[in-house]
Amino acid sequence: MFARALCRLAVAALVLTAAACDSGPTGLRSGYLSLALTDAPGDVDKAVVTIERIYLQPDSTNDNGRVVLLDSAVTVDLLTLQDSLMGLVDSVRIPEGTYGQLRLVISGGYLSIIGADTTTRQIYASSPTYAGLPAGAVVTGTLQMPSFAQSGLKVNLPSDALTIGDDESVSLVIDFDVAQSFGKAAGNSGKWVMSPVLTATKPTP
């Protein structure tokens, strides 16, 4: 039942917009970046993640270093974002230059699976003590989230780069494909694995 429901899910999306300006307070050329999160209706009960940090990773031609866009935890149920946007980052100034990746540091999460009787729930969490669990929740099994809390979830940008130039506006849509991002581990371990499938594209005018 759960696998069938997953296949019917639409994607979630991170929406990025960037607008360059002449200079920042220090005289460096810079732009602005905003992030929002959205999802379309689906049948899965809950798919909750905590995004601890979001940052842009410069490419080899950019000496500006890593740019942190979000540095405070945001916990979101992807399935509540039906036909709407959730603001994550609002107009953060970023230095002019070229960036090769967007990274999301995901510190934890859980899945709630509807039982065959449609009333019971099975919960698979990254940790039994995950702070995003609802009060009184009984964890059925493990949701594996390999290395996302350390190196961050890597999202390659269109043409392998995002360039912010003088007086330029750039928009990107990053699709979080929920249907392909969660799966049950092989064998009888009872574990679920989070392997996010994210793609970054420029929206069609």
How does the language model describe each region?
Residues 16-20:
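C-terminal motif of bacterial Sec signal peptides marking the signal peptidase cleavage site
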Residues 1-10:
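Bacterial N-terminal signal peptides that target proteins for export
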